[in-house]
Amino acid sequence: MASKTKASEALKVVARCRPLSRKEEAAGHEQILTMDVKLGQVTLRNPRAAPGELPKTFTFDAVYDASSKQADLYDETVRPLIDSVLQGFNGTVFAYGQTGTGKTYTMQGTWVEPELRGVIPNAFEHIFTHISRSQNQQYLVRASYLEIYQEEIRDLLSKEPGKRLELKENPETGVYIKDLSSFVTKNVKEIEHVMNLGNQTRAVGSTHMNEVSSRSHAIFIITVECSERGSDGQDHIRVGKLNLVDLAGSERQNKAGPNTAGGASTPSSGGSGGGGGSGGGAGGERPKEASKINLSLSALGNVIAALAGNRSTHIPYRDSKLTRLLQDSLGGNAKTIMVATLGPASHSYDESLSTLRFANRAKNIKNKPRVNEDPKDTLLREFQEEIARLKAQLEKRGMLGKRPRRKSSRGKKAVSAPPGYPESPVIEAWVAEEEDDNNNNHRPPQPILESALEKNMENYLQEQKERLEEEKAAIQDDRSLVSEEKQKLLEEKEKMLEKDLRREQQATELLAAKYKAMESKLLIGGRNIMDHTNEQQKMLELKRQEIAEQKRREREMQQEMMLRDEETMELRGTYTSLQQEVEVKTKKLKKLYAKLQAVKAEIQDQHDEYIRVRQDLEEAQNEQTRELKLKYLIIENFIPPEEKNKIMNRLFLDCEEEQWKFQPLVPAGVNSQMKKRPTSAVGYKRPISQYARVAMAMGSHPRYRAENIMFLELDVSPPAVFEMEFSHDQEQDPRALHMERLMRLDSFLERLSTSKVRKSRSWCQSPQRPPPSTTHASLASASLRPATVADHE
């Protein structure tokens, strides 16, 4: 068993190159990558280089060329990491590279063919095979699946895959995702089914580089909890967490555009990722997706550069969701493997060089892994406590009564339940049967438990029947009761007993079903494979690990020998003649000059890379500025200022996520109850408040109108028409003109008041005539009449 903690452990980096595709061969692209598997070196040749320019060489922990197999990568590189996870360490495997270089193939592969299965299915098989071969250990395996699409975290196993999840941080457990679903799995088939469900909702699309390109970062999380009894007699729980990461492709946006041939896009949440069946439909989404992908990968590169430099005190984990989730895997409590996937074609030179530099920086990261022993929030401990509680209830009901333990025919001692497993006679019998059988011909727990329950139920029924017979005999012997009363009491006793038995049986069956369901979730090894085959498989695994370790040591020794040869060549200072000294020093000078030129070329490439990254960032910044200006324009022209102020007052900065959010309309601490809606009044079509009822009773205009438009009377009053003839002298008289205007205004106001009274009257009120009022025309005629009479006289 590995040590519980190590001072530091370097991040393991391996490189893998795919073969040339048919499309690249047809286009005439040449191969620019050379993989030295023995030395662990990758040599990259610039197709546009000057005649004297040397190729660039990078050294990694392991290198796999185009002829390598999936099993080679897993056995030599990933298998030791999975063994560490089963011992309680955190582990991470992630693939990084350009789109179309084989990241998804490396991580998942082809599920149907065993030889082409990738890291994830091989890890499934490895975990459950180890559990089946373990002894005196109890396991609980659960799986989660998420993706990061355009900087939004989505649960691929949720019924609402488009729902956005939040990142939280706990001082004890670290970074976690709130409301992330998790499924307990019992075998390889179940965990494969969980992953297939998640793959159906993952965001993929067609680009120039790949017809089925991953447009999101996907992380499959496996949590393995193990319970084992220690030397102190107590159960100790270890929790190992495995992150299997399939990153989206890193490439420039002009190469990540939509495929003009038209490729289907299948984003999660059923279309939020854009892109229908044509390339034009996806044209608006692909640049946006590529921008978000490059931003997150750029943040990942900044984190790796800060960790590798050992000079920066601040590590920018919070720059993206991806780096927050991988915080433990990069410089924290985890063992991490990075698989750098490369494209060999000449048109991928820039991307391959960027990937190699990225991987070369990652080699310098130091992690501090430790065993996660006895954490507080383990699901396995909750399962054990729940099983113990159900077992106690069943024993209290007499369904799991104590039985003598079986002894083997060979005189062995009684076999107890496995450590950490709640003792029960069913489990005792199960384990004893397997100990008696050398061939491990086990019986499944389900029939044993069912037979035990049936037998104990029969005993319980027999006891109740005997009790009933005793009560019947007591009633029969009671001479103070008449025969009718005795018969009535006997019938009541039988009915009560039958009812109690039925209720007891239902409750017991429910408890037993829950007990069996909880028990079946826990995995105990040593049952599924024969001992002889078990030992052979263990020996094969040990031999395979020894071979992989020997290859790794051989590769390291060869690298050290090359360095020492260079050092010894420099230290040799004895020459037989001046000619020999000139030749040796000339050769050394040429070699140093070539190194100088390589360093200058590297500096120039770094400068060009810096300019390219800066241009990409400026382009992304300009795009965000355009979007921001558009939103400001919409806000200024279409949203009222008061609504804008309300929105601005609700905004606050969430320091944990570094995002602006809205405060709730109702504070969480205020227990405010909503007002009840007015109940419907008798005879009215709608609910009416008390104020409206009083207003209607007073005859005034009610606040809430309850009348039906069908009950309103039609306005059939004839229009008021005035025909007035004025002489030429009257038309010239200003008082006559004023009189005409007042009469027209009076007619208009009279019609308006009549229509208002009719429309405001409810269907339950009788028609009322408007009160007579003094009109402007009458006042005017009254004021004019004395003057007119005087003039006439």
Swiss-Prot record:
Q: Where is this region: Globular?
A: 631-793
Q: Please provide an example of a Pfam family that matches this protein in its UniProt record.
A: Kinesin
List, alphabetically, the GO terms of the cellular component aspect: cytoplasm; microtubule
The protein's matches in InterPro entries, at most eight in alphabetical order, are given as: Kinesin-like_fam (IPR027640), Kinesin_motor_CS (IPR019821), Kinesin_motor_dom (IPR001752), Kinesin_motor_dom_sf (IPR036961), P-loop_NTPase (IPR027417)
Q: In what ranges is there compositional bias, type Basic residues?
A: 399-413
User: Secretion signal: which residues?
Assistant: none
Residue segments, region Disordered: 251-288, 395-423, 756-793
Primary location? cytoplasm
Q: Which Gene3D superfamilies does the UniProt entry name for this protein? A: Kinesin motor domain
Q: Does the keyword Translocase apply?
A: no
Q: What PROSITE patterns does its record include?
A: KINESIN_MOTOR_1, KINESIN_MOTOR_2
Q: What interactions and quaternary structure are annotated?
A: Heterodimer of KIF3A and KIF3C.
Q: How is this protein named in the record?
A: Kinesin-like protein KIF3C
